[in-house]
Regions:
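Type III/flagellar secretion export determinants
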Residues: 1-225
């Protein structure tokens, strides 16, 4: 499944403090001075809403990556704010979507099966079949286009359901791979992953037959590959 873990290395200006002043030579300020009236006035004059969730998320990130004795500046804060949406949720830089950040708080809740569009299941089925045949059953992370399928799904889902949708699609992907594996073995009992698959071995496997009687919630337990 494709999801994104928070990167504490987001870029914004930090400089070590070598003096006692709260503002350095290039107009930056110590993070400990963020809530001072002078810095708040500068932020508001620059068009930054210091009451917004977007701003608060950016400041939280800055504080977690540095400390009060380090420096930041207005442009750095603006740049960091662009990584968050109006709700203060991290925006993935690859697909421009929020709601895909795995945190300690949502690690458990994201692992649930929800309803996802048939079009996404069909897209995953077709890609899994194509790659299974091309790679002779090998799960090749270097050549797969799975990320595209997951990103297409995420765009169809509401922000709050994106992680769970990805988790659900991963289960269907496992079901499809297992169905193709079983069909290849049925066509040639001596077949092994990495060896050429017998022509037509997967022709009888449709998405409907692959899913028949299978529960996505049990996919991890039932699948062998």
């Amino acid at each position: 499944m494709m999801f994104y873990v928070k990167n504490n290395g987001l870029c914004f200006l930090f400089q070590k403090s070598f003096g006692t002043s709260g503002v350095n030579a290039i107009g930056s300020f110590q993070l400990s001075q963020l809530n001072s009236s002078s810095v708040q006035s500068k932020l508001k004059a620059a068009g930054i809403n210091t009451n917004s969730k977007q701003y608060k998320a950016a400041v939280k990130q800055m504080m977690s990556a540095g400390n009060g004795a380090m420096y930041g500046n207005i442009q750095g804060i603006k740049n960091l704010m662009s990584h968050y949406d109006k709700d203060g949720d991290y925006i993935n830089p690859v697909n421009g979507l929020a709601g895909l950040l795995v945190t300690d708080e949502n690690e458990s809740s994201r692992k649930r099966i929800i309803s996802i569009p048939d079009s996404s299941k069909e897209e995953m089925y077709e890609l899994t079949k194509k790659e299974f045949l091309r790679e002779n059953g090998v799960h090749n992370g270097d050549t797969t286009k799975r990320t595209d399928v997951y990103n297409n799904l995420y765009r169809k889902m509401s922000k709050k359901d994106r992680l769970a949708a990805g988790y659900t699609l991963e289960k269907y992907e496992r079901i499809y791979r297992q169905a193709f594996y079983d069909a290849a073995k049925k066509a040639d009992p001596n077949w092994e992953i990495g060896k050429p698959i017998k022509d037509g071995a997967l022709d009888s496997v449709t998405r409907e037959t692959a899913e028949s009687g299978k529960s996505p919630a049990q996919a991890t337990l039932d699948t062998k590959i």
